């Protein structure tokens, strides 16, 4: 998709970095571990929260709570803006104003709906768990009835989404190239450490392959 799906989804700052291809948007959302969802309360107060998300097709599911102000705002008709970012590198220029980051980000606009259908709720819960740790639902217990009643799941279509990506070296002006200052990129990536068993783990339970080999998609 060469054009922005809507005017408000169009990338304005550095438009050359804007990407509207649904596959590119999906790949970033699938790799990003968390997202931030912003909305405005009925009283006109801005809010933003970090949370987990999962994508199924062209629908983005976001985890929430039945006791949250988010749910009350959405039930009152609030629209949301959801953002996710992956940092790929620190870009060090020869002057501090020219420093930057290499990143991949997605912004989604939409009117969320509360998921109430039980089958869709189950599918979304499974997708959320698999988004964080692929393979986890093969052995971990899924939510019981009490836990489901405490949980809110919001669904937002990806009809109005855009990605923005920066890659490459610093962009120093010609007059700075003679400075005796190191310039370049420090690559950044998410790396899992050695798994730490729970202190109350029963003897004989070994960490599964999806724990020992954990990595983010694309990482």
Per-segment meaning from a language model:
Residues 1-9, 116, 120-219:
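C-terminal edge-of-domain segments
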Residues 5-61, 72:
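An N-terminal domain-cap segment
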Residues 53, 110-112, 158:
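A structural signal for short, well-ordered beta-strand segments
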Residues 54, 68-70, 169-172:
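Short, surface-exposed beta-strand-loop junctions and turns on beta-sheet-rich folds
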Residues 59, 79, 105, 111, ...:
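Structural motif
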Residues 66-127:
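Short, structured beta-strand-loop surface elements
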